[in-house]
Amino acid sequence: MRTYDFSPLWRSTIGFDRLFDLVETAQRAGEDNYPPYNIERVSEDRYQISLAIAGFSPDEVSVTAEQNAVIVEGNKADKAEREYLYRGISARPFKRQFNLADYVQVQSAAFENGLLKIELIREIPEAMKPRRIAINAAPSGTVHQLEGRAA
């Protein structure tokens, strides 16, 4: 009997009920882990993605919001050929995609201290929100006779 681990498929999803499970399984996925990132729930309907992209300038990074996804791409421009004795700061190009749940939208993106922070918000339309329906009761003294009425 074969077993399949589908946890890598859920690695970059935001706004789903199993958010904490998804973050846990992200560490076990075998794909490229560059750049490292955090996904945190700021409040009930707000999330933040933080990507560690030290060495990149805001001009070298793009954030694109599509239907149910956020795509972050970075491409470091080679300025001049340098001879490195040791190169520990990564400058390789990257592309990272985060899948979003329904009604989760990108609110803003900011670059601060080598971290790209993407703010997300879940805005459920008013028509989709649950609403309370008032129950009207008939006055207790009135009895309606249904028989004997003309149809």
UniProtKB/Swiss-Prot annotation:
InterPro entries: A-crystallin/Hsp20_dom (IPR002068), ACD_IbpA/B (IPR037913), HSP20-like_chaperone (IPR008978)
Underlying gene: hspH
Name by which UniProt lists this protein: Small heat shock protein HspH
CDD domains: ACD_IbpA-B_like (cd06470)
Pfam family, one: HSP20
An example Gene Ontology CC term for this record: cytoplasm
Protein transport in keyword set: no
Species assigned in the record: Bradyrhizobium diazoefficiens (strain JCM 10833 / BCRC 13528 / IAM 13628 / NBRC 14792 / USDA 110)
Gene3D superfamilies: 2.60.40.790
Keywords: Stress response
Coiled-coil features, chain-numbered ranges: none
